[in-house]
A protein has these predicted regions:
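Catalytic core of bacterial c-di-GMP phosphodiesterases, primarily the EAL and HD-GYP domains
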Residues: 1-77, 153
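Conserved functional hotspot residues or short segments at active or partner-binding sites
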Residues: 81
């Protein structure tokens, strides 16, 4: 079985198990990393639909996380495919924003729901005013486009406090939990 398809199927199976055990609720989302190769697989949409239906998972419980590297090739076909998946109800996050070929045009043209700020920005937040300014600007632009913002790599309470003061209320990192 292709690893990418296995990840989607296993994620849906995991959600079903957690829902049945009362550990997960239908208003929660699970982020699933999708590689550029997996995204460009012609069978992705059918596999996603099949897995969601097989495990009786609402599409809005999954957030597909893609990186900026996905956008290098054939931007228009990427946008079209993202729109089709989003029309099913599945959400999209751009992961590690700022680490690749960052372009504000992505935020304007892509059907995104979430922007995840790369950990390199977050790690230097307290010690570098330029980084603080960039994070503040990224958050302001994200809000303008109606995107939720997730700060990746939060490892210290001091950084968490700065992020809260900037209006960021979603975080990920060792301060909360190690990756699963």
């Amino acid at each position: 079985v292709d690893a990418g398809l296995w990840v989607i199927r296993t994620s849906c199976e995991y959600l079903r198990n957690m829902l049945d055990r009362g550990i997960w609720t239908t208003d929660m989302q699970l982020g699933v990393n999708i590689s550029p190769k997996q995204f460009h697989d012609p069978g992705l949409i059918a596999s996603l639909e099949h897995s969601l239906k097989s495990y009786d998972i609402s599409p809005d419980m999954l957030t597909l996380e893609v990186t900026e590297n996905l956008l290098i090739d054939d931007f228009e076909s990427v946008v079209d495919k993202m729109k089709k998946i989003r029309d099913m109800g599945t959400r999209f996050a751009i992961d590690d924003f700022g680490s690749g070929y960052s372009s504000m045009i992505y935020l304007k043209r892509l059907p995104l729901d979430i922007l995840k700020i790369d950990r390199e920005f977050i790690a230097n937040l307290n010690s570098d005013k330029d980084t603080l300014g960039l994070v503040e600007a990224i958050m302001m632009v994200s809000r303008h486009y109606g995107l939720d913002v997730v700060a990746e790599g939060v490892e210290k309470r001091e950084v968490l406090e700065v992020l809260r003061s900037l209006g960021c209320d979603k975080y990920q990192g060792a301060h909360f939990s190690m990756p699963v």
